[in-house]
């Protein structure tokens, strides 16, 4: 899982980009976590609790994206994926979920979060 962090020099916004199949992580980092160091630290602390066996799982529901953690992996997904459709879409018109959902190992997420924390902290 590759990623890159940038800061928009005009707006000061922190931006994260992740490799293919993990694009939604970039949106989650940029839009849900942003420069909130306390929120980033909270997720890091929860990961440690799960790794140590103090907790089995955890969910953080955000405005547009949510995070599910368990002993094995992390799932980041667009909240819109949870809505049931009342109608059938043609195959060519089906919703593309690959850019709206991603899975990664807890260690990979922890490493990326630590990097994001340091990047944001340096930029504030």
Swiss-Prot record:
Family: Belongs to the UPF0231 family.
Superkingdom in the source lineage: Bacteria
Name of the protein this chain belongs to: UPF0231 protein SO_3983
InterPro entries: UPF0231
Record Pfam families: UPF0231
HAMAP family: UPF0231 (MF_01053)
